[in-house]
Curated annotation (Swiss-Prot):
The lineage of its organism: Bacteria, Pseudomonadati, Pseudomonadota, Gammaproteobacteria, Chromatiales. PANTHER family: TRANSLATION FACTOR GUF1 HOMOLOG, CHLOROPLASTIC (PTHR43512:SF4), TRANSLATION FACTOR GUF1-RELATED (PTHR43512). It is found in: Cell inner membrane. This is Elongation factor 4. Belongs to the TRAFAC class translation factor GTPase superfamily. Classic translation factor GTPase family. LepA subfamily. SUPFAM superfamilies: EF-G C-terminal domain-like, P-loop containing nucleoside triphosphate hydrolases, Translation proteins. It comes from Nitrosococcus oceani (strain ATCC 19707 / BCRC 17464 / JCM 30415 / NCIMB 11848 / C-107). It is an enzyme of class 3 (hydrolase). Keywords: Cell inner membrane, Cell membrane, GTP-binding, Hydrolase, Membrane, Nucleotide-binding, Protein biosynthesis.
Length: 606
């Protein structure tokens, strides 16, 4: 079924779905595509919109996707639905705000057996702040454990939305999906915009195709956009000619023009990876708009790690791969870095640990790169004794203790929603992570906890630990609050008396001895035995806090002596001893990749 172009603006509906991980968002999208005939039965793969292999394997949505469908309403009119899919994980909240900027409405999907989760609350507030019409939907209503009344009450108490007319659906069986589409058309307002004004289109997303160059997903706010139009990117002032324009149905389908209020893609032969920045405004070259659209708030990376190619010949390929991923993922930051231990690579900034894992996995899969990742660290502020304030995102560049007046660490505000029976375990975890409780509220049978926590304690394993102490029921949303002075020190690792810059950590002084001892022990297990003793030391400045030794392998040099004179044996042993001494002075120790990752495991409780 084709999509006709003659849709008037009053029949366009732009919407997205807000939901926590696993609440059935991608399955609802599949049902919409099925009912509106976007794909034939043969082409309907499960989770059509989660097109990345990685998304299907992990069962999460990483990249926002878009799809345009035709829906024949109960009044006989044909409506044009533009659905923009959004991720649900806390690391990808930036993608969500980007998707919502292109919509007039949102479906808040809540699992009827689990209830409201913190991430949905945060995204829902973002939608309400942006003036979207939010329609509450209860999914998985077919489950025996579904409690629609309790969940409706939670939506009203926690979010403050009227849930008396919440729609009850089961995306798996298809129950209630028709009613949901009808309610969507009735309750979400049509887009506002002026077809006669000069063109203004917002770039929601961009990605790179090796044959076509940059493909941009745009939302046309004013005017219209046709192939052969000459366009200008407002921030860079660069001119391009539109080669193709079209819609995702979810297959790519070309159209004669993108109308006011519509969402579609354009291909304009942009070969430069930075040619169409996300959040930018597209206008015509001749009749151009003077005022750009408000873009998205620039997002700051929270976690930094070094990425180094195992083979130094891959350095340029890594640079190219990062540039292409950066186009599609505005939250990724990178700059060149050199390490004495690992050679040339990049210092990369991420939104969180999941974001980091996914970028690393995409680089390895999509670009066939073999990488070493150093331990992730957060950004610290350092006040030097001269009164300068430095931003430190790499422990190896922290100034010497004598030059530091104070070190400030980033503090976050964490909102945790947890069922009452697990609240004790969650509070215990927050205390262990140096958290300060700010608020505790009872909401139905859930408890809302507000904590201030150091970001460095949260990035490594807080999310996994929170899930394990609450049997998977607690949910977390956090945002940066401020920098606060703390007693932090740099923990260095010395192997045979040499500092290995890639293994340095910034830790709280109270934990330094424990972390140092644990790190040294881990290294002892991972570093292969040599023909000489390898000393592993953990140090704070010049003060050694822990030491272990990888014992030497012993070669039996006296095996060929049968009985005979003891001096013959002694001579061979002395010769071996001298050889080992010389070897220890010049011999370098090969550190395996697992050793760099062991830093991540330090401080984790099994």
């Amino acid at each position: 079924m084709g999509l006709s172009i003659s849709h008037s603006m009053k029949n366009i509906r732009n919407f997205s779905i807000i939901a926590h991980i696993d609440h059935g968002k991608s399955t609802i999208a599949d049902r919409f595509i099925q009912i509106c005939g976007g794909l034939s039965k043969r082409e309907m793969a499960q989770q059509v919109l989660d097109s990345m292999d990685l998304e299907r394997e992990r069962g999460i949505t990483i990249k926002a996707q878009s799809v345009s469908l035709n829906y024949c309403g109960r009044n006989g009119e044909v409506y044009h639905l533009n659905f923009i899919d959004t991720p649900g994980h806390v690391d990808f909240s930036y993608e969500v705000s980007r998707s919502l900027a292109a919509c007039e409405g949102a479906l808040l999907v809540v699992d009827a057996s689990q209830g409201v989760e913190a991430q949905s609350v945060a995204n829902c507030y973002t939608a309400i702040e942006q003036g979207l019409e939010v329609v509450p939907v209860l999914n998985k209503i077919d489950l025996p454990s579904a409690e629609p009344e309790r969940v409706c009450q939670e939506i009203e108490e926690i979010i403050g939305l009227d849930a008396s007319d919440a729609l009850q659906v089961s995306a798996k069986t298809g129950q209630g999906i028709e009613e949901l589409l009808a309610a969507l058309v009735a309750r979400v307002p049509p887009p506002q915009g002026d077809p006669a004004s000069p063109l203004r289109a917002l770039i929601i997303d961009s990605w790179f195709d090796n044959y076509l160059g940059v493909i941009s997903l745009v939302r046309v706010v004013d005017g219209c956009l046709k192939p052969k139009d000459k366009i200008k990117i407002m921030s860079t002032g660069q001119h391009y000619r539109v080669e193709k324009a079209g819609l995702f149905t979810p297959k790519r389908r070309e159209v004669e023009q993108l109308l006011t209020g519509g969402v579609g893609y354009i291909i304009a032969g942009i070969k430069d990876v930075d040619g169409a920045p996300v959040g930018d405004t597209v206008t015509h070259v001749e009749q151009f708009a003077t005022k750009a659209l408000p873009g998205f708030k620039a997002v700051k990376p929270q976690v930094f790690a070094g990425l180094f190619p195992v083979d130094s010949d891959d350095y340029e390929d890594l640079r190219e791969a990062l540039a292409k991923l950066r186009l599609n993922d505005a939250a990724l930051f990178y700059e060149p870095e050199t390490s004495q231990a690992l050679g040339f690579g990049f210092r990369c900034g991420f939104l969180g640990m999941l974001h980091m894992e996914i970028i690393q996995e995409r680089l390895e899969r999509e670009y066939s790169l073999n990488l070493i990742t150093t331990a992730p660290t957060v950004v610290y502020q350092v006040l030097t004794s001269k009164g300068e304030v430095l931003r430190i995102d790499n422990p190896s560049i922290l100034p010497e203790p004598g030059q530091v007046a104070e070190v400030r660490e980033p503090i976050i505000q964490a909102d945790i929603l947890v069922p009452q029976q697990y609240v004790g375990a969650v509070i215990g975890l927050c205390e262990e992570k140096r958290g300060t409780q700010k608020q505790l509220q009872y909401l139905g049978n859930q408890i809302s906890l507000n904590y201030e926590l150091p970001l460095s304690e949260v990035v490594l394993d807080f999310f996994e630990r929170l899930k394990s102490v609450s049997r998977g029921y607690a949910s977390l949303d956090y945002h940066f609050s401020r920098f606060q002075s703390a007693d932090l020190v740099k923990l260095d690792l010395l192997i045979n008396g040499e500092r290995v810059d890639a293994l340095s950590l910034i830790v709280h002084r109270n934990q330094a001895h424990y972390r140092g001892r644990e790190l040294a022990e881990k290294m002892r297990e991972l570093i292969p035995r040599q023909l000489f003793d390898v000393a592993i030391q953990a140090a704070i400045g010049a003060h050694i806090v822990a030491r272990t030794t990888v014992k030497a392998l012993r070669k039996n040099v006296t095996a060929k002596c049968y009985g005979g004179d003891i001096t013959r044996k002694r001579k061979l042993l002395e010769k071996q001893k001298a050889g080992k001494k010389r070897m220890k002075q010049v011999g370098s120790v090969e550190i395996p990749q697992e050793a760099f990752l062991a830093v991540l495991k330090v401080g984790k409780k099994p």
